[in-house]
Amino acid sequence: MNSIYILVFSLLWVVVAYFWYGKRVIKRKLIDPVDENPTPSHAMQDGVDFYPAPSIVLFGHHFSSIAGAGPIVGPIVAVTCFGWGPAAIWLLVAGVFIGAVHDYLSLMISVRHQGVSIPDTAEKYVSKKAKFLFLVFVWLTIVLVIAVFGNLAATSMITKPELVIPTFALIPLAMLFGVINKNRWLPLWVNTIIAIAGLIFLIWLGFQFPITIGTKETAYSIWFTLLMVYGFAASVTPVWILLQPRDYISSWVLILGISLAFIGIFIVHPDMNAPFVIAETFKDTSQGPHVPFLFIVIACGAVSGFHSIIASGTTSKQLDREKDAMFVGFGGMLMETVIGIVCVIIAGAAITWGTGENELQWIFKNSGGALGVYGNGFGRLTSFIFGNEVGVVIGITIVNVFIMTTLDTSVRLARFLTNEMIGDKLPAKLQNKFFYTVVAIIPAFLLGITDSWASVWPLFGAANQLVAALVFIILTAYFYSKNKPIRYTLWATVFMLTMTIFALCWMIWKYFVAAPNYFLGSVAVILVVLAVLMIIEGCKKIGSAKKA
């Protein structure tokens, strides 16, 4: 099959889904937004966390934060393990009916509860115990994300020293954009063009003056430490001066990159040469059996629990009007779905399937894994513009820009979660954003600087999808309490819980029997227990509501 057909169908699919399922079904039947309702960004405006943003700027922040490397890595891994057919189908179906619903509803529930996180709302709609369990679990997950993305960013600056200048010089550029935008010294579109031009110049400057420091170990320690310092700054400074503008500017990098990929697909129009389904690995692969691990491997682009924490963390506090949430939340997720489809095409068509040198499996194993596949495939699609080598570098640079946007947002999210989890239990002198950030940064720093994060990372995919499943429990309980139809969230709750628990049980078998690793096996058991406890709490709430 020619890749153009897949891309065109996917684009039509998400456009129809946005206007039909998003606007006509989910928005009208479950939320019914009213612009006259003051959003937290206005009602609780403090100039630091709560501050209204233009919808396009907020879309850029939200989209950059949820994207990261996820919609690139997951689909490419899935193509190599399961085939391009299952990967594309899961992206298109889940992206619309699970992921976009999950993100939009998480955003709106937070907006209607003073901008608190989804785990915090669990106390009201499920139970106090559910809130505590969920907050602790999500906090630990976010700390792990900070460590891992800090590691990825630091490592990328060692392997690609050309990235050092654009990574750090974007900070003052973003701050300048933020000040100009806040004071309205220039129209937004003019400010945007200047900022994008500035970023392109910084990327060019980075390639002219790559920066290296001492040994690999020394460089890693320095870059990782500086990234944690930056994360601290992005967490405590007003959102409009650094976090929001940096993410917004970065979003244009990915949009321009994906646009180039579109052009490449339409001009080169390669045929899909990877298998539609890899039948011989249907029962067992390095990633686990197709069912349920397809639904774990591809998270971003389909459904990701991490998105709900961003939507109810930073995004809900910046939403200007309730009606903007559809564009930001639902639309942002569908944009990620399109990126996932492009990556399926890159892996399944732009690169020849096979184990020979420079073929897909060889590149995946010997040249940077999924990110190496993306860079090489992007280079081949855009070789008629830049040449293959320059195209590869541009592709990898795009990915690295987005690693930073997930890192800085995660630190701020960890601060919010720390406040919600223990803020009211601390002495008054410690109830401040600086202390909350330190509480989150220190364990993340220790995990990253010692590489200890690697010991638990194999379980992150399942843990992330468990977050999504638990969020759907809360959403279902919320709509049940409001006498709204629960069919749009209940089926997703059951599906995500089933697939996630199935995956965790397989991991328990693997780490206790097939390939013993008792630490990982024990963590998997804890996650299953957490899921069961949340199910029990949710059922109790619905049962008590029926009796009442």
PLM region spans:
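Transmembrane helix-loop junctions in multi-pass membrane proteins
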Residues: 2, 22, 72, 85, ...
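A generic transmembrane alpha-helix motif of multi-pass inner-membrane proteins
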Residues: 1-16, 196-240, 244, 249-250, ...
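Extracellular loop-to-transmembrane helix junctions
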Residues: 2-19, 78-110, 119, 164-174, ...
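Extracellular/periplasmic helix-exit of transmembrane alpha-helices
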Residues: 265-281, 334-376
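Membrane-interface helix-loop-helix modules in multi-pass membrane proteins
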Residues: 50-113, 124-128, 145-159, 324-354, ...
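Flexible loop linkers connecting adjacent transmembrane helices
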Residues: 23-51, 77, 88, 92, ...
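Membrane-interface "cap" regions at the ends of multi-pass membrane proteins
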Residues: 13-72, 251, 288-289, 293
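Loop-to-transmembrane helix boundary motifs in multi-pass membrane proteins
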Residues: 128-143, 331-338, 389-392, 400, ...
